[in-house]
Structures are given as C-alpha cells and as structure tokens.
Curated annotation (Swiss-Prot):
Protein name, as recorded: Nitrogen permease regulator 3
Biased composition (Acidic residues): 75-84
Chain spans, region Disordered: 37-155, 317-387, 812-848
The keyword Signal appears for this protein: yes
Domain of life where this protein originates: Eukaryota
Annotated source species: Eremothecium gossypii (strain ATCC 10895 / CBS 109.51 / FGSC 9923 / NRRL Y-1056)
Function recorded in the entry: Mediates inactivation of the TORC1 complex in response to amino acid starvation. Required for meiotic nuclear division.
Keywords: Meiosis, Signal
Pfam families: HTH_NPRL3, NPR3
Amino acid sequence: MYTNLPKACLTGIVLTISTHSGPQVVYHYPPVKQPVEARRGRKVDSRNERVRSWQAGRMPSAASGAVDAVGEGVDGLEEESSESELDRSSGLSESEVSTDWADYSMSSSDSESEMREDGGGESSAVGGSSAAEGGEESLAEGADSSIAWPGPSESYNQLLESQSMVGSSANVAAASTKPKSIKSRHSQISANKLFQYLTNTSDADSRRQSVFSKLTGNEDSETIRLTDSVNLLDLESLLEDLEPGLADVDISELLDVEVFQPGRFQDVSKIFNFDAEFVAELCSPPKEMCNTRFELTVDDLCFLGLPIHVDESGRWRKQKVKRQQTNTRSKRSSSGGKPDAGSRTSVGLPHGTQERQPSTDQSGSGAPYLAQSSSESGQLRDPEQSDDVEDLQKAVHMFHVCFIMNPQLVEYNERIDDMYHYIVTRLSLILRYIQDKKGYVVRECAKILKTRDRILKKSLKLKKSHGQALQGRYLYECILKSSSLARALTKCFNSIINNEIVTLDIDNHKVISLQIPIKNEFSSLPDLKINPVLRGSYLTSLLNDSFLKQPVDFAAGSMMPGGDVMHDDNDVLDYALLLLDDTPKIIKDLEFSSFGSDLANVIMINLVKNLKPTVSLRSYLPLVSNLLEANLSLSARAAGSRHAASNAADSHSTPLQHSMIRSIVLHLVYWRYARIILPLSSKNTYIVSPLAPIRGTAADDFENTDMVKQGCKALIYQHQDLFHEKFPTLPTLPSFLSSISTCKPRSFGHLIPSKDHNLLYLSVLAWLIRYGYLTQLLTFVWLRVDRRIKIAVDEDLEREGVRTWNSIVKKEHRQNPHDNVAAPTREPASSAIDETASSSEHGDANISDGQESLDDYLFKESDYTIILEPKTATALEKRWLFKCIENQPTEMQLLFRKVIKYFNGKTPLELVEIKENIPKQELKKLIACLDKYVVELKHW
C-alpha cells in the first residue's frame, strides 16, 4: 500500500442518460479490454484467451451478446458456450438482467430489411447504444473477413417474427455471410429469455417511436452520398452537416495511440468486458438514489459518480429565491462600489466564471433555455433536427458521469473518497448547472448519438478501414470533433491518470479546474521502504496543507467588532511565497484558466510578477492597494463621481487587501504554482534534505530503476544539467551540496563570498528548495522551571499571604489531571510511600490527607517542569516563568513578555522574528539571559 504516492486508480469514464425508454451509454473512454493487466495477471490471462479465440473465429464469445437488446423489451440472442462463462463476462446472471428499459423502435425493422437487401454488408442502427454497436460490428465484418461473427439461428428469427418482435440486433447479419460452422450450432437461449419472448404479446406497430430512434434513425439517405474513393472530404462532409467548423477541431492531444492498438482495443459496444447495456442499467439508479453519492463495486471495478436527476417541476437544480432589494442595499450599492469588508473575496478560484445573461423565463422546465442555447451555438440549422433535440431535452430525466476505478483493497476508501470529493462532485455539479441554464449536456449527447449513427452507416472511410482498432479510432475522432463534452471528458481522464491539473472550458460559459492533490510534504521522515514518497518531496514542519485546511474565518482574517482584522498566530501573510515554475509560464497558465478581464485575475498576475521568496507577503499590501485605487479611479472617471475617488484614496491597508492576498496565495498553493515558506535569508541555516532526489530516474521512480538498462540518468545528474544552465559560474550541483552538508550546520551566509554575490546565492538557495534538495533548520524553544524557582515562588506567596503553597498545589493539581506541565523526572523516595501507607491505618479520614501529601511531595521533588503552552499557563505557572527573568535588564523583561507565548515548541524562532519584527541578535540575547531555563531544539 503506497498511500504517499499519487495514484488515481482511474480506468475509465462513462456518460449515461436515461429517458422514458430506458438508460443509454452515450460515451465512454478508453475502449480497452483490461485496465490493470500488470497487477491482476491471474484474471487477465483467462479473459484474453477468450478474446483471442473469439477473434480467430474458433468459438463465439458469450460476452458479445450477454445483454444486447433485440427489439421490444427483449435481450439479444447469445451464442454462449456455458452459463458460468456468461456470468464472468457480464457480471450478472441472465435472470438478474433487467429488460424494462429496452428501446422500442420502429426503425429497426426498416434497418433490418435494408441490411438483407444489401447482402449483409451494412448494419443499421437501433435506438440506444446497440445502434452504434451493430453498425460497427457489421462494418468491421465487411472490412476484415478473417473475423467470424456469430448470429442467431433461423428458428429463433422465425420465433421473433411470429411474436411481432422483429428488431435489429447489434450482432445480427445476413445468414449468407456467416460461416457454416457457427450458423446455428451455437445459437442457444435460456428458459428465462424464452419465457420473456412468449409472454410479450404487444405489437411493435403499436409502440410509439422513442426519442433515440427519432434522433438516429430519421436520416435522409441523400444528405451524404458515398463515393468509390476514400478521401478526407468524407469526414469533413459528415461533420459540417452537423455544425460548421467541426472538421477543424484539433484533437491530436486527446486520443492515446496505444489505446487503439489491436492488442488493447476493445469493441466500442463493450466496457471492460461488460456490455454497454449492462453498464447503462448499472449506472442508472432510481430517482430516490440520484443527486447523492453513487458507489457500486462489480468484480474488481468500482463505479463512482453523482447521478443528476430532474425534480418534480422539471428543473435540474433548485432555484434560489430572489430577495427584494431594500433601501439599505440600494444605498450601499450606490456608495462608490466599495465591497463589504466582511465578505470573503473569491480570487481566481477554480469555479470562477464569467456567465452570460441568463434567460428571464422561469416557467419551471429546462425547455425554455433550449431555443436560446441552440441559436447561440449555431449547431441546429435544420428544423427537423431542432425538433428532435427538443424532444430529447424533454425526455431525458437523468444524466450520470460515472468514473470507473480499480483501487486495491487496502487503499480503497482513501482513493475512492479523494476521487469523489475532488473530481466527481465538482464536475457533476458544474454540468448540472450548465444543463439547467442552457441544456448543454443533453444537447451534446444528441451530437454524440447523431455523429455515431452517421459515421457507422454512411462513412466510406470507416468501411474501408481494416480491423476494429482502426475503425474504433476513426469513430472516436469523429465523436471528439463533434462534441465539446466528449472532449472535456477525455481530457479529464487523460489528466487525472497522469496526476495533472485539468482545466475544462464548459460550453464557453464556465471554466473549471480539477485535480487530486498530491502528497509531497512531510513533517516527519517517512519509512521509505514500506511507504515510499515522490522524489524531491519537501521535509518541513511548515506544511502548506495546514493553511489550506484552515477555516474561512482564519483564511480571510477574523473580524473584530470595531472592523479591524484579528490576525491568527499562524497568519499566511507572515510567510513568503516560492514559485515552483518560471514566472512567464505561470502567468500564461493563469491567463488560460481564468478570464483576463477579471480584476482579481489582474491583481493575481501583477502579484506573481513581483513575488520574491525573500520578502514576506505582508509587504505586498501597498501593491494591491495601488491596483485597487487605479481601478476605482477608472470607475470614478467613467461614472463621473468624486465619491468613488475619495474612497480610493482611503483604501490603503483595509481588510479587503488582506483577504485578497490570502485568497491569491491559497489559490497559487492549491494549484501547485507556489509553496509557502519562511522568507529566505542568508542568516538562516539550511541542510540537505533526507528526501533529496539523489536516486531514481524520475519523481515517481521509487523502485530505483536500473539506470544502465533503462539508459537514463539519475535525477541528481538530470538536475545538474539544469543547475549548470541556470548558474554557469557556480560549482556543480553535487559539489555545492557537499559544501552545505557539513558536520555542524552553519548559516547559509558562510557560503557567500561577498555582498555582491548575495542575490546570486539567494537565487541558488531558492532553486535548491524548489527541487527539494534543501530544507530549513528551524529553532524551537520550551521553558523549564527547576526546583529553586518553585521554592522562590512559594516563599513569595507566603509573604504576600495569599494562600499557602500546599493549598494552591492541591487545588490546581486536582482540577487539572492533564495539566500544562511535563511529567516529573524523578521517582519518589520509598520512605514517603511507606509513610503514606502507614497513615492509612488510622482510618478513612487520614486517607485523603496522605494522598495530598504524596502529591505535594511528587510535585516539589521533581527536578524541573517544562511549560508546554505559556500562552494558556495558569497563574502559578506564569509566576514561575516571570521569576526566571526577574534579575535581568528591563528591556529583556519586556521582550520576554512579548515573545513568551511563542516558547511552546511549535512556533519557530525564525517566524517570531518576522511576526514581531524583532532582530535576530535581540532574540539571541534573550535566549542567553534565560540560559539554563531554555530547552532549545533544532529541527526541520
């Protein structure tokens, strides 16, 4: 179990929708056979053996027709060799597979007649996913004659015709084209399916045509004419008929070439050896189980998602009740446009959007948005097509983006929870929002279904392609060119499996960034043999994750009644920010992932340009104030108001600037652009990190790959080239690290030859920390009180006549069983124990007195006591602490009272210097004055 390594465990992504005619798999990626061949080799062998034998024509596969629909509420006729093999291929037995959702289509009979007239060379579509599956299999058969395609026997066809249930199956072809060896020998049907056939007495002609059949089967045969030669205009004509400009869409970076290799590619009608109909029904829970977490495990795969269902009024999301604008709000809105200081400012967040003006129609259904969104996108030019998509908008009542994962059992909960929290919920909710506003999801599903049907039936290039892998790749290229939603899902999958951040532009309406945060910082040294980490991880007590997990009040600054900001002891503004990449590249990414016209984005980009790791973030408050002042001045000039200009002049150092900088910093840290560190200084001490990337050939190479066999350099030598390119005048990287790694750690300033080299060496220091080679050695302090201080305080209390020392100790020791002091360091004498034991013989009245005297003795006889939290110390403990500094100079006593709360072993002194603006020499003098009362610890 490697929980410290980033691993999404994602194997596929499936988009399903559900209508009155049943669920439908609209799109899935990648179309591969086995997701985890290397780790589950035992199961892969048997499955691959069945696939290879099926492709060679030696035996029909039971999985090919496990859950295929054959018309009106009937599963397809399988060519199965045994019942157990069927269970392994589909995940459910025949009796457990529901057929209530089957698509009742009238276009199937016409398609079958066309197929028979053409001699089995083509295959038509059925409503639902079987349309695409049937078309592709028949086309592949015409292209590759070496593959034997199983089909039902004639007796079963006669049975279907007698029951008026003639339909087009995904694996049905003309009998003349089938090999004689499998023409009718292996065509079998279970008793359960036969009972379903015989009991279904409904006439197919009485069924109303489904939305999918109208959408995919209502094609004009003269729109695209097939030619005798293959040319590039085939794809362009098909796509231009859907929407202008689709043929020019670049998808070169989306499709993985290895997915469409003959050894890995699987039929598009299959999803990891499961039939598409089975997965569609699996991912379509009832309404009561929608709009909440969906998690279902089948075999070794986990289906995770958030199915979105319409409510009773037909809306995809609840509408917020608009409050009437009161006079108070109107006055505040017209007072110069100054934002409320108490509100949290959202700066460059992943959900930041620039929306178009929504429709004012609030009739309660998603249909009013269809006409507007359709006219804006320009994709529905044909009135008949517009009617079909409008019918689909009204018919679809659920959509589900389901993520298929295969985590190990020992890390199942962690991987599943991370995927659901960071990816599934955010993507599903943003799709629900855009579907409710503009009908985007259903509109894109209509594009995918129409493109798939046209390509399978009318594409000459697809028919001329040899092999299922080439045909599947061509089909996916067409789908990705036609649908922006398919491109977004594919891009999301490719980025997540590579542990990258993905930025999706949803219908030019919303920009969303998704990622699963990686674990690359540790406060304690992990066991690398049991649980390895990424090469170059950061080893420090200042964890960036602690800032991201802070509540909103601490992140944005807690507000006091007077309107001032009450800073937390661990305020992020006291730290510096170290960029993890080159500044131009970060700015380019920020401009791409957000809207450039946003004021927050402008401030963030200007802040990134001026960031230095040697300066605390609080120093950039004037920069933010100047940018806000310039913006308010422009607004005042445009509005012709002097009141806004006066507000701009008084905008320095307000809570708004503090909140904006905090939000920008947390944004940059969360999206891996920067790290929060203490400001770099030549007076600080830095050491070579135990997690420095010395070994391995890559960041995730935790197995120490043999570099000779792989022909790769070690990480340190790869970084050596970068180091020499950036700092050509300095020694090599190993030599520089050896000069830092000395027996006794020294300040970094000992390496700087002169003041002229200060900036250069600080740049080197920032580079080494960025790549994980160095970590800062921090100083932590506790205060300890010895026996002499306790006796002196006891004498003072007796002279003051407050109370006896024993009574104070007894009360505080009883009330604080888990007190603020460390455990005593010496055991009591045996004589005291014997004395206490003998006193218990005089009766119950003396038991309590004996226990009190024992407690007093234990407390007085301890050599010293360490105060763990001076900030929350009791009155007696504070007397002890101030007694330690009593005979020191007045300035030292004042400094001690100022910094005593930081002597808790948790706050480094290097941070205290910045927070309280105290010189390092003054702190050293104070530590020297305290002398034996200080416990000092050097740690990262």
